[in-house]
């Protein structure tokens, strides 16, 4: 897959033209995009917001889980019950970028939103 033609949706600040990829398991970017649970996600989200504000050539790379982090409810005995809800990401824009990598000798498809 050739990513050379990918363009940021804003003009890059000439002071920050070095291309940078930020890898994280969590990104707290928006509540609707629930791919975070706490500190790591908020830190990564803050880095993304700062990079956007500075107009850096910067992308975040993480995993978009089908079921994401679970919600919780309380049982009658006050124990916690996990609730796995399939997440809806229809608000994300499809970039059309899709490619295959190999993990432990198995093909895994990667899609970019």
Regions found by a protein language model. Give the residues of each.
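Catalytic cores of carbohydrate-active enzymes across secretory and cytosolic contexts
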Residues: 1-113
């Amino acid at each position: 897959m050739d990513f050379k033609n990918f363009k940021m949706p804003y003009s890059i600040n000439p002071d920050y033209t070095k291309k940078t990829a930020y890898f994280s398991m969590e990104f707290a970017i928006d509540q609707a995009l629930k791919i975070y649970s706490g500190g790591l996600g908020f830190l990564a989200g803050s880095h993304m917001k700062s990079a956007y504000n500075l107009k850096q050539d910067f992308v975040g790379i993480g995993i978009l889980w089908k079921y994401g982090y679970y919600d919780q409810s309380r049982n009658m005995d006050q124990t916690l019950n996990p609730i796995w809800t399939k997440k809806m990401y229809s608000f994300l824009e499809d970039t059309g970028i899709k490619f295959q990598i190999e993990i432990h000798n198995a093909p895994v498809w990667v899609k970019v939103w």
